[in-house]
Amino acid sequence: MRPTGCSLRGRSLKKERKVFKELLPPDEAMRRLEERVPPTPPEAEEVPIEEALGFYLAEDVKSPINLPPYPRSAADGYAVRARSTWGASEDEPVELRVVGEVRVGEAPGFELKEGEAAEVDTGSALPPGADAVVMIEYVKEVGDKILVYKSVVPGENVLWPATDVYSGQPLWKRGTRVDSRVIASLASVGIRKVRVWRPKVYLISTGSELVEPGKPLETGKIYDVNTYSLQARLREEGFVPIVHGVVPDDKEEIKKAILEGVEKADVVVTTGSTSAGPADFVYRAVGEVGEVLVHGLAFKPGKPVMLGVVKGKPVFGLAGHPDSAYFNLERLVIPYLRKMVKADERSQSSTKAVAATSFVGAKGRRTHVPVSLLTDGSRWFAFPASHSDHAMVSYSKADGYIVIPETRRAPVEPGEEVEVWLFKDPSYKGAIVGDTDVAVDAVVERLDYPPKMLPLGSYSGAYASKMSLRSVWISPEAVGKEVEVEVVAVGRGERVGVPHKSSFLYPFFSKFLEVEGISREELQKRFVRVTMPTPQALASAVASGEVDAAITTRNAAEALGLDWRPLSKAKLYIGWTEDHAELGREVLNEFLRRGG
């Protein structure tokens, strides 16, 4: 007699049992799949930015405006012409006449003259003529006048146009995963909708023994875990699971489910029924409606994994045990999906880094400083994410932040170890650090991956060169290939765009004044000075009318159709580490092609 519970199925199907003849390394298995079914992006969908959360940008995004779009107050107080306050002190305050006020959301309806002041709030637009803001705590109001007890310099407590981002500046590369910081930056520049990729994954759990969680569990049955764990993991990564549910161990039912899946989704994932036993039907089903490319991998867990193609869509047959299925999804399916959308790396919590420059905290306050990280292969090095404390877009692209305690009086010094709390995984495929020009923008636009950009000026480029940080560096002080960039003047007028002290353009500002016939004394008395971080920002500010004149590069001027006047030639050196040779040569050739 046959024991109760046994079946003759094993005997009748014994001839169908398959033996794994070739166990491939995972990399080789995926190479075969990707050669047969390249991981190309799905059709893009346009969605409101609030619905884009978690998905992947399907195209590069540029800023349509300068940010800030107009001069704004960074403090509550009074807008003034800075020179009107010079000489002010606690003992001898300067008296100014209050001629109006500008509230947040209002457009100034008057021009500020010397000896005058206008009350402003944090975020208010500055009236024409104003170039600084005296904080309210340094002012005493006396009727229609104020007494100023502390002098200010041009630009103090002012957010100038394009100091965060300039019109046309690349913000995010396609393939960037949309998170709350990306949405904040998009809203900051007025973008309402974006095109995203949302790859759909069809999930099929196979096994006559599987029961939906929540239902009574009979002897011989187990709960279906894979349907729930895998769809959750896919959602965590920004992919869209379509759940078919449980299919019994029946070849025809499995075939039907797979054929339905390739019609509804971009990728099909099955779990269970992939081994070599007589009741393992997935590879047989795929073989009948498509092609089995790989069956059996040389890693654990994952030996019975099957990779195939049906009607041009990839089919992943994963092991049925929940731990194995999850591991297989993580190691095989998710990397394939990330390639489809050119995804960013996943996040970490914190890491140690070396301060690449000094970081100064606010006295008596715990200070969080956004940073970008580069590596020499063994250590991370922390750079400031921006020159400005009010740069939302730059902040949103930071890798993380360091915390300077409120009790610390001394700055964080270069070379000091810091703890970086991460917004995301700081790993990168490519990075460009130091000085910049539109030649760099042109190269970035051609790349099919999002490089890490640190346009922080000459010091950062020289530091990356000195420390051999994995990157392409650009600086007049670095080691590398020499290129010449033509420095030019654009526009004329009393509102002057000044390069940041970290920029390679800054040493040429004296030449700009000489050619324009402006003395240092006149500059102090007559001109409004607006500091900008890059040649592109300076040119953009002139093109948009935010400043009247500026020093920039010929490339930046011509990119915006500006007339320019020659000033001088700047020498820059472009170098790179070996792993950045291809990107470095592309940047170098773009500078040479543009010829200054």
Which residues are covered by each model-predicted region?
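Helix-rich terminal scaffold detector
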Residues: 2-27, 192-318, 322-328, 332
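Short, glycine/charged-enriched hinge/interface segments at domain edges or termini
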Residues: 14, 20-26, 79-245, 259, ...
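Flexible glycine/proline-rich
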Residues: 23, 27-30, 40, 45-50, ...
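Short loop->beta-strand "edge-of-pocket" segments that line small-molecule binding or catalytic clefts
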Residues: 432-434, 490-513
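Short helix-initiation/N-cap motifs at beta->coil->alpha
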Residues: 436, 448-461, 524-540
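N-terminal segment of the mature folded domain
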Residues: 438-492, 575
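A ligand-binding cleft/hinge motif common to bilobed small-molecule-binding domains
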Residues: 460-472, 540-565
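Periplasmic-binding protein-like
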Residues: 480, 484, 561-589
